[in-house]
UniProtKB/Swiss-Prot annotation:
The gene is CYP4F3. GO terms for molecular function: 20-aldehyde-leukotriene B4 20-monooxygenase activity; 20-hydroxy-leukotriene B4 omega oxidase activity; arachidonate omega-hydroxylase activity; heme binding; iron ion binding; leukotriene-B4 20-monooxygenase activity; long-chain fatty acid omega-1 hydroxylase activity; long-chain fatty acid omega-hydroxylase activity. Belongs to the cytochrome P450 family. It is a single-pass membrane protein. It catalyses: an organic molecule + reduced [NADPH--hemoprotein reductase] + O2 = an alcohol + oxidized [NADPH--hemoprotein reductase] + H2O + H(+). Its EC number is 1.14.14.1, 1.14.14.79, 1.14.14.94. Pathway: Lipid metabolism; arachidonate metabolism. GO terms for biological process: arachidonate metabolic process; fatty acid omega-oxidation; icosanoid metabolic process; leukotriene B4 catabolic process; leukotriene metabolic process; lipoxin A4 metabolic process; lipoxin B4 metabolic process; menaquinone catabolic process. Its cofactor is heme. It is found in: Endoplasmic reticulum membrane; Microsome membrane. The lineage of its organism: Eukaryota, Metazoa, Chordata, Craniata, Vertebrata. It is an enzyme of class 1 (oxidoreductase). This is Cytochrome P450 4F3. Gene3D superfamilies: Cytochrome P450 (1.10.630.10). GO terms for cellular component: endoplasmic reticulum membrane.
Length: 520
């Protein structure tokens, strides 16, 4: 009886081949990965069915392209908050799901989860990495926790108090320009352009103790920061350039590298100069000299910071934190100030009440400067700032990637691996959270009204362990700038209504134009 064997079939030599074994192992590994991904995807789809979703464009695109960085995109976000009330599921293509959240009840489990469980989503933030490094904005895990603990003293009120003089000086320079431009009665100004330069001027003095006179003449360093912000925004809108290799072949990618190098060289030079000063003076003499000038800048605080084990930050870490503060501190504050001036121009009765509050505070004072202790004496002006931050939050959304299942108060579960988009704008415009959300009403922030709602109904600085570490700095600067601006100028609306444009921060298409009239 004939016997069948591998050799008789001519298969034995191939079966013994190491290449075939390698191919089988590789194919098995790939098949296992595909099956695991398919199971996870199917399981997530089943678990996401409890979240409502708006109609898709089609099965392949999902909801991709339904929201643009435009006025219409913001209006669509408002409609989602109105329609769904708390949250919805959003598909980017056929595979990628995002849970968009619009309600304080469901924001809390995500933002207040430990930072290791819900780190920031890296898709967009990765564009900033070559510029900002592993600063607080982009770092994660133990490194983020260590840096957060070490940086917290930099924002203590004793450190912030001396910055008030810098805020006053910088806004005085901006106002001197406005007085010249309005010498014939009034001037039409793009608030973003003027206020961005002013905030960068203040930050450069607070971070580096360096005065570039950028409000009066061009500064290469300031121009590089503005260019980097614009290039990151532009790249975000070009999906093919998400790939680093392709991006750095383009003229924009090369400009980005040059601007990064310039910014890093400036920061490194300041750090090295301080490093040389410290050994020659000693820490005690250095602090004594700083005490006489009453100002410790951000670089000083970082150089002197130590963790629980007595370890200091490296020069690379210090550069990352300084560059992060320059990036995060100028655009967000400029956006907040520009929009509050817009609202007060549209509501002259609130503008006049703010002006009277500042006049009463400074009536017997020369020069007219706002000091740290004055900040608590401007309650109505503070209410106006907060209501503007509600309607026009500088950062319209923040994202988190769930590294484990997040259980919501109603029992629903956001599966591991899903990105949560906390819609700050949607929450602030949600009629289930804020009655008549489109009305500018500063009295929402009257102390007696605040206690009636969730603290997470108002989150312009985010919330939880990864909230904005510089919010006290930002609020202090906004109060000084707004108070002195209203003391010296009447702000009037422009004839064209701005169209909002969410980029890195909430801007206006073509600038936010207002008219200013000197009061004396």
């Amino acid at each position: 009886m004939p016997q069948l064997s591998l050799s008789s079939l001519g298969l034995w030599p191939m079966a013994a081949s190491p290449w075939l074994l390698l191919l089988l192992v590789g194919a098995s590994w790939l098949l296992a990965r595909i099956l695991a991904w398919t199971y996870t995807f199917y399981d997530n789809c089943c678990r996401l069915r409890c979240f409502p979703q708006p109609p898709k464009r089609n099965w392949f695109l999902g909801h991709l392209g339904l929201i643009h960085s435009s006025e219409e995109g913001l209006l669509y976000t408002q409609s989602l908050a109105c329609t769904f009330g708390d949250m919805c599921c959003w598909w980017v293509g056929p595979w990628h799901a995002i849970v968009r959240i619009f309600h304080p009840t469901y924001i809390k489990p995500v933002l207040f989860a430990p930072a290791a469980i819900v780190p920031k989503d890296k898709v967009f933030y990765s564009f900033l990495k070559p510029w900002l490094g592993d600063g607080l904005l982009l770092s994660a895990g133990e490194k983020w926790s260590r840096h957060r603990r070490m940086l917290t003293p930099a924002f203590h009120f004793n450190i912030l108090k001396p910055y008030m003089k810098i805020f006053n000086e910088s806004v005085n320079i901006m106002h001197a320009k406005w007085q010249l431009l309005a010498s014939e009665g009034s001037a039409r100004l793009d608030m973003f352009e003027h206020i961005s330069l002013m905030t960068l001027d203040s930050l450069q003095k607070c971070v580096f103790s360096f005065d570039s006179h950028c409000q009066e003449k061009p500064s290469e360093y300031i121009a590089a920061i503005l260019e980097l912000s614009a290039l990151v925004t532009k790249r975000h809108q070009q999906i093919l350039l998400y790939i680093d290799f392709l991006y750095y072949l383009t003229p924009d990618g090369q400009r980005f590298r040059r601007a990064c190098r310039l910014v890093h060289d400036f920061t490194d030079a300041v750090i090295q100069e301080r490093r040389r000063t410290l050994p020659s003076q000693g820490v005690d003499d250095f602090l004594q000299a700083k005490a006489k000038s009453k100002t410790l800048d951000f670089i000083d605080v970082l150089l002197l910071s130590k963790d629980e084990d007595g370890k200091k930050l490296s020069d690379e870490d210090i550069r990352a934190e300084a560059d992060t503060f320059m990036f995060e501190g100028h655009d967000t504050t400029a956006s907040g100030l520009s929009w509050v001036l817009y609202h007060l121009a549209k509501h002259p009765e609130y503008q006049e009440r703010c002006r009277q509050e500042v006049q009463e505070l400074l009536k017997d004072r020369e020069p007219k400067e706002i000091e740290w202790d004055d900040l608590a004496q401007l309650p109505f002006l503070t209410m106006c700032i907060k209501e503007s931050l509600r309607l026009h939050p500088p950062v319209p959304a923040v994202s988190r990637c769930c590294t484990q299942d997040i259980v919501l108060p109603d029992g629903r579960v956001i599966p591991k691996g899903i990105i949560c988009l906390i819609s700050v704008f949607g929450t602030h415009h949600n009629p289930a959270v804020w009655p008549d959300p489109e009305v500018y009403d500063p009295f929402r922030f009257d102390p007696k009204n605040i206690k009636e709602r969730s603290p997470l109904a108002f989150i312009p600085f985010s919330a939880g362990p990864r909230n904005c570490i510089g919010q006290a700095f930002a609020m202090a600067e906004m109060k000084v700038v707004l108070g002195l601006t209203l003391l010296r100028f009447r702000v009037l609306p422009d004839h064209t209504e701005p169209r909002r444009k969410p980029e890195l921060v909430l801007r206006a298409e073509g600038g936010l134009w207002l008219r200013v009239e000197p009061l004396s």
